[in-house]
UniProtKB/Swiss-Prot annotation:
NCBIfam families: S18. One of its GO terms (biological process) is translation. Pfam families: Ribosomal_S18. The keyword Ribosomal protein applies. GO terms for cellular component: cytosolic small ribosomal subunit. This is Small ribosomal subunit protein bS18. GO terms for molecular function: small ribosomal subunit rRNA binding; structural constituent of ribosome. Binds as a heterodimer with protein bS6 to the central domain of the 16S rRNA, where it helps stabilize the platform of the 30S subunit. Keywords: Ribonucleoprotein, Ribosomal protein, RNA-binding, rRNA-binding. It comes from Buchnera aphidicola subsp. Baizongia pistaciae (strain Bp). Part of the 30S ribosomal subunit. Forms a tight heterodimer with protein bS6. HAMAP family: Ribosomal_bS18. InterPro entries: Ribosomal_bS18 (IPR001648), Ribosomal_bS18_CS (IPR018275), Ribosomal_bS18_sf (IPR036870).
Amino acid sequence: MVRYFRRRKFCRFTVEKIKEIDYKDLSMLKNYITESGKIVPSRITGTSARYQRQLARAIKRARYLSLLPYTDQHQ
């Protein structure tokens, strides 16, 4: 019987020693939202709970300031 092991997910922010997630860093924030505009959960990205909260707060602030769209397209 062959077992397949997934590679362990890691928190990118912990590795890079980032203190605070900035809402103005749109290129980084876009990596953590889906095409439809939803925030990707930490079980998918591997982000730790502390940084997931900061990430959600930064994305919501960027949406409020119209830096990021709430949804991809309105049709």
